[in-house]
Amino acid sequence: MNPTLALTEDLIRRRSVTPADEGCQAVLETRLKALGFTCENIVSGPDDFRVTNLWAVKRGTQGTAGKLLAFAGHTDVVPTGPLDQWSSDPFEPSHRDGKLYGRGAADMKTSIAGFVVAVEEFVAKHPEHKGSIAFLITSDEEGPAHDGTVKVVEALKARGERLDYCVVGEPTSVDTLGDMVKNGRRGSLSGKLTVKGVQGHIAYPHLARNPIHLAAPALTTLVNEVWDAGNEYFPPTTWQMSNIHGGTGATNVIPGHVTIDFNFRFSTASTPDGLKSRVHAILDQHGLDYTLDWTLGGEPFLTPRGDLSEALGAAIAAETGVKTELSTTGGTSDGRFIAKICPQVIEFGPPNASIHKIDEHVEVRFVEPLKNVYRGVLERLIA
């Protein structure tokens, strides 16, 4: 078995459901120390949600004056869902029809294994490499992400650590390896809106104020609002409701309040403060008595075309013959934190059709090419 596949299987066997790491980072640390990496463990979070983070660095011959290329990834995985719906044990790697099955196979233990082995091969070939290499690994990406990458970034920023390039191993490919990479992500802004009314008997509406009826016109306005037109890199900002709850459960009672959960996925054409102001203005125009709590999940980030995108595109083309597409679609990732200390952040990994699903898998034919692309990026940027 090739080293990349062997390491991937070792990681899959570890039941690292957020925030558990289950020894994944210890495995990585052992291999990285053997290459001369200096490893730092950053543990964060409350006792009932302890998060393990690993920051590992190997300096090149140019020291801190040289370029630093980091790989960012997460060892945690989402829960399995119903075990009886899996074709095999999600934490026991299984090969069927040219695919490797297991939770985390696509998201993102294959990427982590691929970059580790790529670095091993790169260092063996270029022992005097000029630039530096780093790994930023967390066990809190699939969860609340309060004590994962963001904490490492804060620590690095506080001591003036500079990152020049960062490859995030998220599964970005669609139909075949390398057909899409992410050079940015939209921001996420959520709101919990509570519109107040007056509870009463449904047969006496004149003695009550129905908050659902009061909120409906404002919600229609919000649904139809054009928030921005997007730009060259991002689609227009979207506003979507995810939950509406009002009522006591009885069919003859007008509720006293209704609560609506909503979310913006926004581009660099809008700002969180600007979106908040516009929502409040619409609600105020409709004369609502309301409270509104906001949660900023992350601001958008964008890496324009540059050294990293060119190196990654060239490495993908050389290995697969595929001309990659730069995209900012999809959900948020830890790239939003890393972008605060790194000017060039790009995500690249295997196809994502099975992520978070029953029978998650990666096609075995993509495992070695993925590793080779990562090695190609290292060779193009820091050799």
From Swiss-Prot:
Cofactor note: Binds 2 Zn(2+) or Co(2+) ions per subunit.
EC numbers: 3.5.1.18
Residues binding Zn(2+) 2, per UniProt: D107, E142, H356
Needed co-factor(s): Zn(2+); Co(2+)
Pathways per UniProt: Amino-acid biosynthesis; L-lysine biosynthesis via DAP pathway; LL-2,6-diaminopimelate from (S)-tetrahydrodipicolinate (succinylase route): step 3/3
Ligand binding (Zn(2+) 1): H74, D107, E170
Top EC category: hydrolase
HAMAP family: DapE
Protein name as it appears in the record: Succinyl-diaminopimelate desuccinylase
Gene: dapE
